[in-house]
Design a protein with these regions (language model features):
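Compositionally biased terminal segments of proteins
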Residues: 1-242
Length: 242
């Protein structure tokens, strides 16, 4: 079983990272680390950091390597699904997942998310911002890891503004140009209902979008399956007329 780390440890690691920075770097803390700093979670296995561009990604990786972190070259299937650009771990077993704008290959760190975030730590050249609890809830809903549903339940207890969550969901659809990721949100909301008997105001709009996604997928697959048969039929007619 992997080690878990509290907010004090995470803060000390972030401050250690700041000691190695020579130019400004802003990172956005999502997931369990963000919840830990808000006293919503005692410990977490991973520190999920989002940066806004490739230069910041490279800068953070270099600093983490300087701090003794090593790149995890063969993460478990659970981590493959996260689609982090970099996964690094230190000697204590603290793992940092680094994302460049896109998280879990399903959500983008949007302008609205950045605007809603709050600065939690400023140390040297490092600025650490916590994304809002509403946005953490949305990230958790697509992450697909074991503890995420329980974390979503904890977040609901804080009195989330689901108008914000729904508006961000619509914004993500516009940014990504597709709705498929909403089906993952739907699965998470169903699990939340089954495990904790909690139905959020997000359930109905997400369910409607998911039904539309499934209908479109059915049409696509039906069309895709029909193409070989159509081609074979045309070839048969051609040969019979020869």
């Amino acid at each position: 079983m992997r080690e878990r780390f509290d907010s004090e440890y995470i803060r000390s690691e972030l401050e250690r990272i700041s000691d190695h920075l020579e130019t400004p770097l802003t990172v956005y803390l999502i997931g369990g680390g963000s919840m830990s700093f808000r006293n919503l979670k005692e410990t977490t296995k991973d520190v999920d950091l989002v940066v806004t561009d490739g230069d910041a990604l490279q800068q953070l990786q270099v600093v983490l390597l300087d701090c003794g972190y090593e790149v995890i070259k063969d993460p478990s299937e659970e981590y493959h699904e996260l689609s982090a650009q970099r996964i690094l771990e230190n000697a204590d077993g603290c793992r940092i997942d680094v994302f460049n704008q896109k998280v879990v290959d399903k959500l983008v760190l949007s302008e609205g998310m950045c605007d809603r975030s709050v600065t939690h730590l400023e140390a040297g050249e490092l600025t650490v911002a916590l994304v809002s609890t509403e946005d953490v809830f949305l990230f958790k809903s697509v992450a697909g890891r074991t503890d995420d549903i329980d974390d979503m339940f904890t977040l609901v207890q804080t009195g989330l503004d689901f108008d914000i969550v729904e508006a961000e969901l619509e914004q993500q659809i516009d940014l990504l140009g597709r709705e498929l990721f909403v089906s993952y949100v739907n699965e998470a909301l169903m699990s939340l209902d089954e495990r904790h008997n909690i139905t959020t105001p997000l359930f109905n709009p997400v369910s409607k979008i998911t039904q539309r996604v499934y209908r479109e997928l059915e049409v696509f697959h039906a069309f895709d399956d029909a193409i070989p048969r159509s081609c074979n039929s045309e070839r048969g007619i051609a040969s019979s007329n020869a």
